[in-house]
Structures are given as structure tokens and as C-alpha cells.
Regions:
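Conserved short alpha-helical segments that host acidic/polar catalytic motifs at enzyme active sites
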Residues: 1-140
Length: 140
């Protein structure tokens, strides 16, 4: 089972990462945010915390999010594109679970969606919903 964790403090984030390493040792992904910077990092397997922050040590982030991955679907090789977090438009997500209707969703929203990971389509869904709500608001 995957681990999803986050903190507003770097040291607490590192502690949470160390506690979640065993929950998913296939890959680790991170999202670091402040008002002007968003950094997404992904690594195969378990890495030392210092690698998560390489080149960002001097940046003062306000939010640290992480995901340790243990794939629940078919066996696959590590790839940046098939590891959390997933990004589309304004949305970045990490998800723990299985979308049992992934095939239907994929066909409904974008039959050319190439990513085999079910969770990867969630930010596309959010982005589509945002666009629909914007259209509805403009029609009122």
C-alpha cells in the first residue's frame, strides 16, 4: 500500500518520509511549494532524504508533500510518467487506491490518454470539471 504524507515543515516531512519508506518502495515522488515555486521530484525505489532536496536546499518551501508508491495494478517498470504525483493543467495529485472504472473514464474524457496508471487521469478530471464550471458560470 502506498503512503501519502505532507507537512509545512521540512524536518517533519523528512520524518514522515522515513516512516513511509516501507509502505511503498517502488518509487517516491514529492511536491514542494512556496508562493513562487513548484518543484516535482520522482525517484525509483527508496532514496536518502538528501536526494529529495538536491538543488532546493536554499529555497524556503511552505508545503512539502510526498508519496511512496507500491503499485496495485500490473507489474511495471519505473518511469517518471507512471509515478506520483501526477500533474495536468493546474492540478497535481497523489492518490492511494484503485480506480475500478479507469477504462471507462479514459474513453469518456480522452481516449488518447497513454498513461497506464489509473490515478494519472484524476488531474485531467479535475481540470475538465473546472472548465465545465467556468462555462456554466459564464452562461448564468
Amino acid at each position: 500500500m502506498c503512503g501519502i504524507f505532507g507537512s509545512t515543515e521540512k524536518q517533519k516531512f523528512i520524518t514522515l518520509y522515513n516512516l513511509n519508506k516501507k509502505r511503498g518502495n517502488f518509487a517516491v515522488g514529492t511536491l514542494f511549494l512556496n508562493q513562487s515555486t513548484m518543484v516535482i521530484r520522482k525517484f525509483e525505489g527508496v532514496v536518502e532524504p538528501v536526494r529529495l532536496f538536491k538543488n532546493e536546499e536554499e529555497v524556503d518551501f511552505q508545503m512539502y508533500l510526498g508519496h511512496t508508491q507500491a503499485p496495485t495494478s500490473a507489474k511495471r517498470d519505473y518511469s517518471f510518467n507512471t509515478s506520483h504525483p501526477f500533474e495536468y493543467g493546474d492540478w497535481v495529485i497523489a492518490h492511494n487506491g484503485v480506480l475500478t472504472n479507469f477504462g471507462e473514464i479514459k474513453n469518456e474524457f480522452d481516449s488518447k490518454w497513454k498513461n497506464p496508471v489509473d490515478s494519472s487521469i484524476i488531474p485531467l478530471l479535475f481540470s475538465s470539471l473546472k472548465n465545465i464550471l467556468k462555462i456554466m458560470k459564464n452562461k448564468m
